[in-house]
Curated annotation (Swiss-Prot):
Gene: DARS1
Entries under SUPFAM superfamilies matching the protein: Class II aaRS and biotin synthetases (SSF55681), Nucleic acid-binding proteins (SSF50249)
Protein name: Aspartate--tRNA ligase, cytoplasmic
InterPro entries named in the record: Aa-tRNA-synt_II, aa-tRNA-synth_II, aa-tRNA-synth_II/BPL/LPL, Asp-tRNA_synthase_2, Asp/Asn-tRNA-synth_IIb, NA-bd_OB-fold, NA-bd_OB_tRNA
Keyword field contains Cytoplasm: yes
UniProt organism field: Pongo abelii (Sumatran orangutan)
Catalysed reactions listed for this entry: tRNA(Asp) + L-aspartate + ATP = L-aspartyl-tRNA(Asp) + AMP + diphosphate
GO biological process terms held by the UniProt record: aspartyl-tRNA aminoacylation
Classification via CDD domains: AspRS_cyto_N, AsxRS_core
Annotated positions binding ATP: 273-275, 281-283, 424, 472-475
Chain positions covered by the region annotation Aspartate: 251-254
């Protein structure tokens, strides 16, 4: 007599055969073989952002990530995400989908990449949880192109939840270190996608504006023989049998290009600062947007050109990136960025007077601390209703050796900083273009003349008066969007405690 287990097996076998026979959709779903460029295909993949009412009733192919999946009886709802856009997809038992296909779709791991064929259908009620609110995709085929591991280091829904909402409702949010440790996942969120698309827009607008103004884009060396700012905060690297340094700025080379008659130059590239500053706004490596320009009679010609460039960037961002701004504001609410035309300019002594009136004790030659910068930003916003302004005529004592002194006041300099929401985003000045005065100032700052000989020599053969400035890309992005930490606007941030990923 057969055992109970043998009897069960004999009963299961016909059921398996029957189930396989019932799976009439088995060719319509599954795990695809790895794409190794085996063959080319004429299949057209439609972008999720293009799934609109205009495509209603069309059959389309889409490649996207599985953001969420939810099984409900004989159907499964998926949210398919592609960058910052997403659409609801429905897999339901019917002519094109078997119950096995529905079960397969419901069990695809989050963040897996899938190819889906489906019919675009107009919905009667807007799908508020998706960017594509007027349509959904009725799935006919679904294949996994790249399977994600079942356990994610962070949940994307948690990563985009406003902190206030998480605190009020007791729901999970994701802390900064977890985000940065798993940066590739964090960068997939709609907020991160919006931040870095807007940041790309800043670079594009900077380049576009300056080229239209007649500037030439240059590239400068990042491995240099002497500290470009003359300070100690440099990274030393081994350079064959000598030591070299990572450039703190392209300053000296921008000026050399002006001496070489390029007249107006700019560059976009990495800047390195070996400062042990663990603050919300400091990085050891960031992207510098640098400008240098010859002028005719007064350095304000350059200062005003830079200010206008910033205004053109702000205008361009507000015109072209409203969707991204609104996406970031959902998670990090913020007042819209305000600026004036022409840009507000105050002299440093006027800023000191405002701070002293507010109870701050400062000497005439003291530099602004971060708290005082922020306070000044609030005072200026209250008085002038602008988030962007210039402080001019800084004390000479707090500026680099190559800064031109003010001929009318030896304690002041022809230098300026630009601010957004009470934080400095640009430092600039007229440069010393006379080799004798430059030598004197370098010695005053204790700089080894031998290490900057090529720089000083470049002024010995005739140099036009010139000025410029350097902007921190990550800070501009952070402050325009009203974010609170520069690590949110650095794709893979470097600070004194972080060297990976």
């Amino acid at each position: 007599m057969p055992s109970a287990s043998a009897s069960r097996k004999s009963q299961e076998k016909p059921r398996e055969i029957m189930d396989a026979a019932e799976d009439y959709a088995k060719e319509r779903y599954g795990i695809s073989s790895m794409i190794q460029s085996q063959e080319k295909s004429d299949r057209v993949l439609v972008r999720v952002r293009d799934l609109t009412i205009q495509k209603a009733d069309e059959v389309v192919w889409v490649r996207a990530r599985v953001h969420t999946s939810r099984a409900k009886g004989k159907q499964c709802f998926l949210v398919l995400r592609q960058q910052q856009f997403n659409v609801q997809a429905l897999v339901a038992v019917g002519d094109h989908a078997s119950k096995q296909m529905v079960k397969f779709a419901a069990n695809i791991n989050k963040e897996s990449i899938v190819d889906v064929e489906g019919v675009v259908r107009k919905v009667n009620q807007k799908i508020e949880s998706c960017t594509q609110q007027d349509v959904e995709l009725h799935v006919q085929k679904i294949y996994v192109i790249s399977l994600a591991e079942p356990r994610l280091p962070l949940q994307l829904d948690d990563a985009v939840r406003p902190e206030a909402e998480g605190e009020e409702e007791g729901r999970a949010t994701v802390n900064q270190d977890t985000r940065l440790d798993n940066r590739v996942i964090d960068l997939r969120t709609s907020t991160s996608q919006a931040v870095f698309r807007l940041q790309s827009g800043i670079c594009h607008l900077f380049r576009e504006t300056l080229i239209n103004k007649g500037f030439v884009e240059i590239q400068t060396p990042k491995i240099i023989s002497a500290a470009s700012e003359g300070g100690a905060n440099v990274f030393t690297v081994s350079y064959f049998k000598n030591n070299a340094y990572l450039a703190q700025s392209p300053q000296l080379y921008k000026q050399m290009c002006i001496c070489a008659d390029f007249e107006k130059v700019f560059c976009i590239g990495p800047v390195f600062r070996a400062e042990d500053s663990n603050t919300h706004r400091h990085l050891t490596e960031f992207v510098g947007l640098d400008i240098e320009m010859a002028f005719n009679y007064h350095y304000h010609e350059v200062m005003e050109e830079i200010a206008d460039t910033m205004v053109q960037i702000f205008k361009g961002l507000q015109e072209r990136f409203q969707t991204e701004i609104q996406t970031v504001n959902k998670q990090f609410p913020c007042e819209p960025f305000k600026f004036l035309e022409p840009t507000l300019r105050l002299e440093y002594c006027e800023a000191l007077a405002m701070l002293r009136e507010a109870g701050v004790e400062m000497g005439d030659e003291d530099d602004l601390s971060t708290p005082n910068e922020k306070l000044l930003g609030h005072l200026i916003k209250e008085k002038y209703d602008t988030d962007f302004y210039i402080l001019d005529k800084y004390p000479l004592a707090v500026r680099p050796f190559y800064t031109m002194p003010d001929p009318r006041n030896p304690k002041q300099s022809n230098s300026y900083d630009m601010f957004m929401r009470g934080e400095e985003i640009l430092s600039g000045a007229q440069r010393i273009h006379d080799p004798q005065l430059l030598t004197e100032r370098a010695l005053h700052h204790g700089i080894d003349l031998e290490k900057i000989k090529a720089y000083i020599d470049s002024f010995r053969f005739g140099a036009p008066p010139h000025a410029g400035g350097g902007i921190g890309l990550e800070r501009v992005t952070m402050l325009f969007l009203g974010l609170h930490n520069v690590r949110q606007t650095s794709m893979f941030p470097r600070d004194p405690k972080r060297l990976t990923p």
